[in-house]
């Protein structure tokens, strides 16, 4: 029978005439909805009930401090999560060693690169799945070797003696003990302005 009215316990946004519910303006919770047909034609009023539930949508943010991380780091890097718990972690592209449950990352077991970490909360209670993201970077450990051809050098040599360097560039040169005339940027050694002796260049 049509023509009845709808009502519910407090907190549910419901149209009394149509029974239409607006979840966005309702408070999360479980409600009893009553449809009542007034007494008429000598018949008593009739009512029927049903239950509806409004769930709170999941929400979360994630972040990692200290990125980029060098691949030499063997201790776990932990995630900071704010919001809904119970989600799972993943990363794109492949190559990042990450715990799907805790979100912890182990740089030393990861391939160098930049990754998007995803924290996914599954769809539930009529609400869509929620995904929070963060970006992390793993950098390759610098590797280099150096050598000087022709050493030992006679102290009478006035021309600079160049270094042969392989691997990562951009470093600075130094020596010990003191007494070696070396260019910190290029690694060039000048024997004539150096003190005779044996030096370690690094």
Features from the language model and the residues they span:
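Solvent-exposed strand-loop boundary residues in beta-sheet-rich modules
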Residues: 10, 41, 85, 93-95, ...
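Well-ordered beta-strand positions in beta-sheet-rich domains
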Residues: 46-51, 104, 130-135
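Surface-exposed, short loops/turns at beta-strand junctions within beta-sandwich domains
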Residues: 25-29, 109-113, 193-197
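Low-complexity "stalk/linker" and mucin-like segments enriched in Ser/Thr/Pro/Ala/Gly
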Residues: 3-22, 90-106, 174-190
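Short, intrinsically disordered, charge-balanced linker/junction segments flanking boundaries
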Residues: 1-3, 198-202
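Short, exposed coil/turn segments at beta-strand boundaries within extracellular/luminal domains
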Residues: 40-47, 124-131, 154
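Solvent-exposed, low-complexity, repeat-rich "mucin-like" stalks and linkers
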Residues: 1-7, 50-90, 139-174
């Amino acid at each position: 029978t049509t023509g009845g009215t709808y009502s519910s316990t407090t907190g549910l946004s419901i149209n009394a005439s149509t029974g239409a519910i607006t979840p966005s303006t309702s408070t999360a919770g479980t409600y009893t909805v009553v449809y009542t047909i007034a007494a008429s034609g000598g018949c008593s009023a009739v009512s029927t009930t049903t239950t509806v539930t409004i769930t709170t949508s999941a929400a979360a943010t994630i972040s990692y401090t200290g990125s980029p991380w060098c691949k030499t780091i063997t201790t776990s890097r932990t995630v900071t999560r704010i919001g809904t718990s119970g989600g799972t972690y993943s990363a794109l592209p492949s190559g990042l060693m990450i715990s799907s449950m805790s979100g912890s990352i182990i740089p030393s077991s990861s391939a160098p690169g930049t990754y998007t970490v995803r924290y996914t909360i599954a769809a539930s209670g009529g609400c869509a799945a929620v995904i929070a993201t963060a970006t992390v970077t793993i950098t390759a450990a610098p590797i280099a070797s150096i050598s000087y051809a022709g050493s030992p050098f006679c102290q009478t040599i006035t021309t600079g003696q160049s270094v042969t360097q392989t691997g990562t560039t951009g470093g600075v040169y130094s020596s010990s003990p003191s007494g070696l005339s070396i260019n910190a940027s290029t690694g060039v050694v000048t024997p004539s302005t150096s003190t005779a002796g044996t030096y370690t260049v690094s």
